[in-house]
């Protein structure tokens, strides 16, 4: 048997305090409807795996309640019936949310042993928990090019002639967060007599993604050893000891999540009331500047920290599907 985690008898639930101010409204004989919700929340006693010294602890990390974070934002939804008659309706609906996240505090200790709560690694490479910044803050080296030996070069910000790759290195700079600052969706629907159609567009933005997969496949030293991207030839970087912002990309996207069209046949038969035929497409297209497979990463990833929350080391692509539907309603 081996020890895989340290015991902590003082673990408790995270606590959250939240204030909401909401408004629901309907105007123009209920043709214009909407909601507005403003919130301010604070979560304390955050559960997280922190680094501890060995000894006295047998395992290098311990799950503990340390720190607090703040979330502030606004959520808005609107729907408007552009056409509303007996035979046809056209409704435009959508929602959007904007959020500001901040790490308020990370100080803490267990039984007098201080925890490493400053610049704690969070998910992707070069992503940390830093007081005063959003969770998943990227502190990273700035790519400047390559030298005569085709080795990547980065900016020496403090000018001391040494590239410091330490967590608190003065050569690192804040380059954004893995957490989106806004999300949105657009959901129009149309009906004319027995025909109906609807779609769902959604997206998010304001976040960064560290494309670790692209980084691993962009070194010419790996030619003949493993796969290398065609773009690596143009970049011409033979090797690199750095994880620079060359691989940090915008994670914004717009996705056509769903498109459905259908027609309903009505019967006077004593057994069948209606038969509806429909055609549905899911994940039909994606608009993004991200060069990876998909900018919408799973927060849980594969279970490895480097694959979580803003890090992409290779994910399964989302399935694109087209389905035919038949719905029979009996009397």
Task: Indicate where each model-derived feature is located.
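Transmembrane beta-strands of outer-membrane beta-barrel pores
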Residues: 38-44, 80-82, 96-102, 192-194, ...
């Amino acid at each position: 048997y081996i020890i895989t985690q340290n015991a902590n008898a003082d673990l408790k639930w995270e606590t959250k305090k939240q204030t909401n101010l909401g408004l629901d409204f309907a105007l123009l004989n209920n043709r214009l409807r909407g909601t507005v919700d403003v919130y301010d929340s604070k979560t304390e006693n955050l559960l997280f795996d922190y680094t501890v010294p060995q000894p006295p602890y047998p395992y290098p990390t311990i799950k503990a309640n340390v720190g607090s974070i703040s979330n502030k934002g606004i959520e808005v939804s609107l729907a408007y019936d552009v056409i509303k008659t007996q035979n046809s309706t056209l409704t435009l609906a959508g929602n959007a949310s904007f959020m500001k996240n901040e790490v308020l505090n990370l100080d803490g200790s267990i039984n007098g042993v201080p925890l490493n709560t400053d610049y704690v690694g969070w998910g992707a490479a070069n992503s940390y928990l830093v007081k005063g910044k959003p969770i998943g803050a990227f502190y990273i080296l700035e790519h400047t090019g390559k030298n005569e030996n085709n080795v990547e070069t980065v900016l020496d910000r403090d000018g001391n002639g040494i590239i410091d790759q330490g967590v608190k290195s003065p050569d690192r700079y804040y380059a954004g967060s893995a957490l989106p600052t806004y999300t949105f969706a657009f959901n129009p629907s149309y009906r004319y007599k027995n025909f109906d159609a609807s779609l769902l567009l959604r997206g998010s933005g304001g976040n960064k993604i560290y494309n670790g997969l692209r980084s691993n496949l962009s070194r010419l030293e790996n030619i003949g050893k493993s796969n290398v991207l065609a773009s690596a030839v143009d970049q011409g970087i033979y090797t690199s000891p750095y994880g620079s912002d060359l691989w940090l990309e915008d994670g914004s996207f717009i996705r056509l999540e769903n498109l459905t069209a259908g027609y309903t046949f009505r019967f006077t038969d004593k057994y069948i009331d209606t038969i509806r035929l429909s055609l549905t497409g899911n994940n039909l297209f994606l608009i993004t500047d991200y060069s990876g497979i998909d900018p919408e990463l799973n927060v849980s990833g594969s279970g490895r920290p480097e694959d979580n929350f803003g890090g992409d080391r290779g994910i399964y692509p989302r399935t694109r599907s087209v389905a035919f539907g038949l719905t029979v309603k009996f009397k």
